[in-house]
């Protein structure tokens, strides 16, 4: 129960007295104590005592220069081992040995500093060895021993609820050593290519732009000190448990440590990432410390790792650890009075109410990066919804309609409340405490029926009686469930809802916003480019803006508050190929600045044939929202025929259903199969079904699953009330016709060979790849990988392959097999294999470039290359999840209607990577909000693209997206891969919806994420053979 009790375990360490040695001569501070005993599980030295203390965190440690000496380990020669917590090790000549878990000398001839063991040997020892730095010195008197405990009593010290004491490793019952470094991906032979030239020069016009990048100023001569801080519960303390410590626990313990007089002078000059990395502008005392915070005791190891000179920021490539260290410092210097969510910093002083229990906070998204103009901080405007702080009971009353405290909640109400409250942070109001809890869930029973066994008396007590007797609280809403605030499985902590309060600063799920709140939030977020620029500048110049305050001053960093200015270029659009009619030439030139075109009196490049089609109308019983069927059929047939699609004017089947059918997977299958069989009875093959719906419905997922994996029917779903509208109806029908033609094998728009520089002289293929991951709260569902490939000369027809793979696996498994299949389709259609392949990869971070080159590309080459077939390959990564924005510098320069840069705006100097081959391209006409350019990286190029050629190729590929008559924001191969992966996600969710609900016992033991219990990705459905090579996903 909430009055938690518990006992810690006892640990025993065995040690035998070791040899004695003096303090370090000619060293810094001698040591922390006299030479002495063995470490945990260790034994005393076997060799003769050395001259000086080795560096360790137990008696015998120190920084003296001199021979081995004392301290926990096994010295087999020269002066004995210098044991100590995790590293220890003498720094003089000789030594080696084994300390607590690891150890090892640092001197020539000594063992290496190792993980789990040191070991003797020559210079360097094992793989973790570091060179020795000691030199011989005369023995010196041992320093006085440190006090056993030091209570903070200095009048100038901050108030503390605990104690900090330095301890020896022999006093630690159990502290696990740090895990060895783990590589993110397999190391390979390939690295991302460097920029081949100074950037492109081709353009319609050059434009002056402002970019939301701000120069970070720092002192070149400064040095940052990197420490590893390891915080664990002391299991010998009464409140010890096996629970994993939270980030809040780490921060609390770190703050308590820096109230101690040994650390307090640097309390305003420290940056901590909340995990293992701590950065300061001066040296810290290192060693083991026992820190007491309230009723818990922690063991804290502070170990020096490395000096990081900021002068290295001007080197190329910039050392990763220096950039990571400065990133932590900048985050710390930007967090004053802020709520931090990921890379976002939100100010409570800039809140706007958008609903009864939700506010929107304005803030920034910040990213530190190196560019050609130096170290910059990218600052973007951001809006995030947050819950209002207050009683949990208020939230319950708003979430549950017709709440009656005299009756229990029904299942629907209970599920609604669980979804609202799970994961929320609360505090209790029946006792004076600042302790915070995370809601694990709700009890199945109401508070009036909950009992527990008292740990002291062994008697069964009612929960309500406990709160009445212990705290004098009479629970009014006895029929409501309790919040489960348990921190471990063996200690239940159920608290009545009315005794809990929501903490401030908690993110509100966007999916839970009502329609009005969602609309208001979008209006705040999707502001015009000029307004976004002003918001960013206001946030950067604010008193609590980035890189402000004492921490920034201590580290000597500041921010130039002016946006960076760069020169961009506007690329010319390509010539497009349309269909011919009435003697029209097939070549079509775009002359509009916004690069849009219309299809009035024009035909599609290749019209498909739609002979057998039908209508399954789910809106038939929806009253005023029901489809006007006759009008729709007349309009869509006429539009398709005008555009060159050979469409039968009469449907072969029409079925009138209601929306409820979508909620029953079995009935839905029967109705759809009935349509297929009706066509078969007429000796026809059903190609496409129109499926109007009166509203968005989850059954859409099941419909796609059934038609595309079981029946082999393509579908075109749409909202009936939009098709009925007279205003804009012609454009709506045109948009439907574009999708229909693509699905039935037609081609809407094509590129000429001249629009594909350096590859059009031989058969070529564009491949796009992406991985769709489950939502953040989902811990079991598989990730969905999709690969698409072009199979025609006009780069407009694509074939997909979709696979499920393990949960959150980013590397595309079986990429080689999928590419081999796609090349086989290409060869079947063109009677030749592609000799040139352009591989576009979406959704990977900078740190995963090695994975793309040395895992995915290697898998592809292994599968497709043979003695007789070896195509050349270019690898391009497309990134949309960044916060760089481009703004026209002058209001009078040419721009879109809402102030965005024109389509085709490219930037490849100044704000790009100082070494990589990258560029920003804004290829679309942003109609709402501020346009986000796509950031392209070329990782490998076997075709020798110059910057102009590559930028032209990528931009031109944005014009062949089948669903619209304008360039899109992402190269079409990548866009299609994203759509195909999302379609695979719909299949999986539809499959979960079609399964019978689990039993109560099974559901109680399963995870609460969507799709729980169905993480076996091998059961993912395969596409129907009739659709496997079609563009059904557009």
Swiss-Prot record:
UniProt-recorded Gene Ontology molecular function terms: RNA binding; RNA endonuclease activity
Residue ranges, annotated region (Disordered): 1-201
Gene Ontology BP, a term: regulatory ncRNA-mediated gene silencing
PAZ domain location: 391-504
This protein's UniProt keywords: RNA-mediated gene silencing
UniProt keyword Zinc, yes or no: no
CDD domains, sorted: PAZ_argonaute_like, Piwi_ago-like
UniProt feature, compositional bias: Low complexity: 172-187
Domain spans labelled Piwi: 688-989
A Pfam family this chain is assigned to: PAZ
The keyword Ribosomal protein belongs to this UniProt entry's keyword annotation: no
Chain intervals with Gly residues compositional bias: 18-125
GO annotation, cellular component aspect: cytoplasm; nucleus
Protein purpose: Probably involved in the RNA silencing pathway. May bind to short RNAs such as microRNAs (miRNAs) or short interfering RNAs (siRNAs), and represses the translation of mRNAs which are complementary to them.
Record-stated family: Belongs to the argonaute family. Ago subfamily.
Protein name: Protein argonaute 2
Organism, scientific name: Oryza sativa subsp. japonica
Primary gene name: AGO2
